[in-house]
Amino acid sequence: MPLVISLREKTSIPVEVDSVRLEAVREQSLDEVRQTRVQYGNKQVPLAEFFDVSGSAANDQELVWEGDCSHVKLIGSELSAGRIRVEGNAGMHLGAEMSGGEILVTGNAADWVGAEMHGGIIRVKGNAGHLVGSAYRGGHRGMTDGLILIDGNAGNEIGHSMRRGLIAVGGNAGNQIWRKKKAL
C-alpha cells in the first residue's frame, strides 16, 4: 500500500511541501511523516495540521496526494526515483527540478510544471498553467531532459529556455511557445 497524504480541506494560503520528499518519507514512520515541517504562509507547521497520513512508501516507493491540492506547492520537487500520484489538482512547481521517477496528476496542475526538470516523466490528465518545463526567472536553463505530457490545455511560455526533453500538449497551448530556431 502506498503512503497516502489526504488534504482535509482546501486552504486559501499556499502550503509548500518540498520537505515531503519520497526519498525521505519511505524511510520514516507515520508519526515522523506527520511531524514533517511544511511552509504555510510565513510560518512552518507540521504536515498533520492540514493532511491525514496513512500507509507506507517503504515497499512500493509510491506517494499519493489526495484532494484538491491546487494550493499545495512543490509536490514532487527534486524527485529522483519512485512514483507520485496526485488524485485531484496540483499546485505550482509540480515536479520542479526532478531528475527521475514519475508523477501522475488526475486533475489540473498550476504554473511551472516540471520547471528546470532534468529527467523523469510528468503526466497531467487535465490542464496545466503557464511556463511548463521552463526556466525560473533569471535562470538560463529550463527543462534539460525528461517527458511532460499534458492531456488538456497548457498556458503561455511552454518550454522557455528548454534544452532537451519532450513536452506534448493534447489540447490548446498559449502564446510564446519556445522552439529551436531553424537555420535558413
Language-model segments: which ranges?
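Long, distal/terminal scaffolding or interaction modules
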Residues: M1-L184
